[in-house]
């Protein structure tokens, strides 16, 4: 299936009026990753899944090459627990990590986006059983979810299931009849978040995974110090070095290694492949 994400008009930050791209066109923007719910419904995907006895949908929404599509551990936990929603988390590195916070509110699993989490709350710490000081809100959402199809079908019938969140953005628009490109945020965009379904779920499972194994996002420009193409490649290279070393292959520290997912999804599959005894140069493994 291929289907389009929905859109919402952008409004002026000062007076709430809808911004215009031209005299006959509204300034429209994507309605957030939560727009997936209405898109799945409107495209007929959910009904098709029910008719073909597809009970579970896997969902990953960010540029993360280490996200394993249909992760067997996540799917297994989800099915064995008969969950409506299951999700992966990693431990936060810093209080101000730009990732969502998975929390319990009145014993209900919920998500608070980093932009909506007060700094003093994010910085709170606690002491674990080993006497180590840890962040109180440590569970970082990495946007890997598994949903029950029946749950999504139920939620798709509830027009109020996903509220809209305001996002201050810079939007090119008409001003006094001229098209202008502001240098500071001038508009509000309306976005829905898929994790706002969590409070509606009867059973939610949260699975912690290792950052070095499951999370190498590409979100920032090259000049940034984290979540760039360069840092993503470095994380992948370190992981593949470990895989190869643990299978008995000697790998030169300076060699850049990449393993195509069709060649091996994990170390267990890699062990079944014919591998060189030593790698000294940059190497790409593929079928």
Language-model-detected regions and their locations in the chain:
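Short acidic donor-binding/metal-coordinating loop in glycosyltransferase active sites
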Residues: 62
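Catalytic core of tubulin tyrosine ligase-like
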Residues: 49-58, 66-250
């Amino acid at each position: 299936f291929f289907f389009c994400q929905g859109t919402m008009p952008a409004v002026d930050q000062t007076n709430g009026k809808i911004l215009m791209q031209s005299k006959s066109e509204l300034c429209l923007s994507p309605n957030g990753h939560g727009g997936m719910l209405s898109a799945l419904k409107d495209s007929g995907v959910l009904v098709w899944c029910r008719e073909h006895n597809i009970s579970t949908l896997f969902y990953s929404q960010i540029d993360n090459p280490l996200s394993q599509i249909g992760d067997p551990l996540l799917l297994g936990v989800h099915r064995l627990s008969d969950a409506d929603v299951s999700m992966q988390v990693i431990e936060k590195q810093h209080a101000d990590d730009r990732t969502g916070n998975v929390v319990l509110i009145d014993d209900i699993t919920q998500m608070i986006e980093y932009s909506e989490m007060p700094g003093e709350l994010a910085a709170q710490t606690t002491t674990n059983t080993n006497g180590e000081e840890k962040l109180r809100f440590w569970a970082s959402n990495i946007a890997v979810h598994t949903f029950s199809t029946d749950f999504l079908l139920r939620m798709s019938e509830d027009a109020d299931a996903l509220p809209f969140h305001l996002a201050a953005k810079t939007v090119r628009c008409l001003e006094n009849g001229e098209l202008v490109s502001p240098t500071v945020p001038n508009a509000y965009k309306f976005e829905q978040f898929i994790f706002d379904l969590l409070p509606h779920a009867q059973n939610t499972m949260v699975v912690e995974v290792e950052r070095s194994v499951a999370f190498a996002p590409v979100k920032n420009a090259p000049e940034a110090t984290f979540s760039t193409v360069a840092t993503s490649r470095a994380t992948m290279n370190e992981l593949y070095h470990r895989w190869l070393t643990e299978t008995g292959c000697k790998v030169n520290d300076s060699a850049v290694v990449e393993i195509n997912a069709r060649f091996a999804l994990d170390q267990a599959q890699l062990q079944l492949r014919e591998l060189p005894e030593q790698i000294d140069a940059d190497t790409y493994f593929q079928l």
